[in-house]
């Protein structure tokens, strides 16, 4: 399968992109927006198989992480920059008509783009384990924390209240929380793209979102689009896991308000159903894309 890699100049830096497969008439490319901010494209390589059906799959490292790593420029890490980067990448690669999949932060970006920019040429959106409200996300994560041991609850909430995230108790509790709702430990049996070392954008995450999933304090903390979801007119597939950071309540909040939407709940998944239920996810996604070309 053909894989093309390259860089696009952006704001004096460079944005890395990776294109899998070749264009086939009648099948619009699938563009992938990774999470974080700062998580890199790597985990999306488990979706390369989609290109075998003749559909080009395009992923990239957003500025601040991976092969587009930048640090010491906190002024970059906001929605305007990341959406401008997407707009420029579409121009650079001639992506007039696409399907757009955003996972976690990438889904926030897709919603923001859809509602505030009203872009042309989007055949469908796939909102994967994402959110329409930072406040609701915070509330749901804190609800989840209430089910943890009293020791872990105290460690997590003390850190939030004091602003001191350095204690061993906090970091151990955070690790348990993320393993429960985000992803398990990477092992020798994990896909190669997950085992590969990556340059995460920790500054992008902290400046953009905050110190952890339940403390949105960064440039994205005012993200609130629930009451405007009805403005998304394109077909929209919401996907989430049963024990996802994107709780079923968060997913249903989006599904209920987007007019032309479908929701697929993955029973055995946390925050990355495309990894934990890979075959099913690819089947569901491929059927969706084929139906909405």
UniProtKB/Swiss-Prot annotation:
Q: Which UniProt keywords apply?
A: Aminopeptidase, Hydrolase, Protease
The UniProt record lists the EC number as 3.4.11.5
Tell me a GO biological process for this protein. Answer: proteolysis
- Answer yes or no on keyword Protease: yes
- Give the UniProt entry's GO cellular component terms: membrane
Disulfide-bonded cysteines: none
Q: Where is the active site?
A: 104 (nucleophile), 244, 271 (proton donor)
Q: Which ranges carry the AB hydrolase-1 domain?
A: 28-277
- Tell me which InterPro entries the record gives: AB_hydrolase_1, AB_hydrolase_fold, AB_hydrolase_sf, Peptidase_S33, Pro_imino_pep
Q: Does the keyword Mitochondrion apply?
A: no
Enumerate the GO terms in the molecular function aspect.
aminopeptidase activity
Pfam family example for this protein?
Answer: Abhydrolase_1
Q: Which domain of life is it from?
A: Bacteria
Catalysed reactions, semicolon-separated:
Release of N-terminal proline from a peptide
UniProt similarity note: Belongs to the peptidase S33 family.
Q: Tell me, what does this protein do in biology?
A: Releases the N-terminal proline from various substrates.
State the name under which the record lists this protein: Proline iminopeptidase
Q: Which organism is it from?
A: Clostridioides difficile (strain 630) (Peptoclostridium difficile)
Q: Which gene encodes it?
A: pip
């Amino acid at each position: 399968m053909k894989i093309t890699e390259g860089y696009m100049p952006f704001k004096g830096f460079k944005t890395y992109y990776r294109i899998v497969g070749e264009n086939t008439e009648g099948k619009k490319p699938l563009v992938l927006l990774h999470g974080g901010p700062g998580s890199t494209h790597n985990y999306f390589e488990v979706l390369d198989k989609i290109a075998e059906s003749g559909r080009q799959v395009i992923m990239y490292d957003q500025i601040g992480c991976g092969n587009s790593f930048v640090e010491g420029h906190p002024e970059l890490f906001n929605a305007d920059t990341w959406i401008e980067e997407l707009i420029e990448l579409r121009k650079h690669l001639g992506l007039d008509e696409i399907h757009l999949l955003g996972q976690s932060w990438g889904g926030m970006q897709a919603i923001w783009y859809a509602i505030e920019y009203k872009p042309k040429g989007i055949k469908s959106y796939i909102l994967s384990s994402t959110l329409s409200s930072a406040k609701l996300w915070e509330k749901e994560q804190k609800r989840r924390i209430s089910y943890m041991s009293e020791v872990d609850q105290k460690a997590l909430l003390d850190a939030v209240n004091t602003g001191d995230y350095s204690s061993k108790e906090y970091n151990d509790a955070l690790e348990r929380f993320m393993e429960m709702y985000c992803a398990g430990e990477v092992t020798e049996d994990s896909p190669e793209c997950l085992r590969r070392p990556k340059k995460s954008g920790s500054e992008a995450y902290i400046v953009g979102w905050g110190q952890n999933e339940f403390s949105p304090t960064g440039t994205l903390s005012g993200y609130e689009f629930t009451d405007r979801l009805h403005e998304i007119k394109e077909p929209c597939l919401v996907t989430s896991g049963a024990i996802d950071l994107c709780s079923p309540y968060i997913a249903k909040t989006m599904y209920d308000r987007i007019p032309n939407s479908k929701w697929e709940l993955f029973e055995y998944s946390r925050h990355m159903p495309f990894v934990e239920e890979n075959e099913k996810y690819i089947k569901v996604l491929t059927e969706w894309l084929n139906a909405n070309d």
